[in-house]
């Protein structure tokens, strides 16, 4: 079983990939989206990732890409009209990490991505710094963790290190008019 926590896989060209064929895929997102692929056997759950409906040790894999940086913050800008989701809890993501740990089978894999660099709350998302990544690791322990860091440069995304990426900044494509020098948007 695979949980797509945040609906990053909800595109036909991804769902048709041979690696996802014959998999029991659940897509969990805050609110219904324009496209749904029930005909492909996808199960959709509309819920807050801080309090899921799944039993303990249910998933073999969880993917949560470009999602947890929005948890606990103002999700009314892009994702829902539910005023209850106009929040400002900068640590709300930790409840989702606890939930991922609870519903992931022992030995299961979590694929998680967050924007990393200089911490900044943008209202509807936040940039994670080293302390916040460490809090994720502590919350998800005990388990084996492998970290990878990437940085955007003029030529595109490149492998980096925690130290080198710690000063990265991001352009907010939805609220700012001028791109940063590196064109890295979040």
For the regions a language model picked out, list residue spans one by one.
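A C-terminal cap/extension of S-adenosyl-L-methionine-dependent methyltransferases
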Residues: 130-186
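Residues lining the SAM
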Residues: 65-68, 84, 113
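A short glycine-rich, Lys/Arg-flanked "PGG" loop and its adjoining helix->strand segment in the class I
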Residues: 80-109
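A conserved beta-strand element that flanks and buttresses the S-adenosyl-L-methionine
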Residues: 63, 72
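Conserved catalytic-core motifs of eukaryotic protein kinase domains, centered on the activation segment
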Residues: 73-78
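Acceptor-substrate binding/catalytic loop of class I
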Residues: 87, 91, 112, 117-138
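A short acidic, Gly/Pro-enriched loop at the edge of an enzyme's catalytic core
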Residues: 50-62
């Amino acid at each position: 079983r695979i949980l797509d926590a945040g609906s990053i896989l909800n595109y036909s060209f991804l769902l048709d990939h041979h690696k996802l064929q014959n998999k029991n895929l659940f897509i969990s997102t805050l609110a219904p989206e324009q496209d749904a692929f029930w005909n492909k056997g996808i199960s959709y759950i509309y819920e807050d990732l801080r309090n899921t409906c799944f039993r303990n040790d249910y998933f073999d894999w969880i993917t949560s890409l470009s999602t947890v940086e929005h948890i606990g913050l103002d999700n009314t800008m892009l994702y829902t009209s539910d005023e209850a989701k106009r929040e400002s809890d900068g640590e709300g993501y930790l409840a989702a990490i606890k939930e991922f740990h609870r519903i992931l089978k022992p030995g299961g894999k979590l694929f998680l991505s967050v924007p990393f660099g200089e911490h900044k709350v943008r209202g509807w998302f936040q940039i994670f710094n080293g302390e916040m990544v460490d809090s994720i690791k502590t919350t998800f322990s005990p388990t084996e963790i492998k970290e990878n860091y990437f940085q955007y440069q003029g030529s595109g995304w490149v492998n980096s290190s925690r130290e080198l990426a710690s000063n990265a900044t991001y352009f907010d494509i939805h609220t700012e008019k001028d791109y940063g020098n590196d064109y890295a948007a979040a």
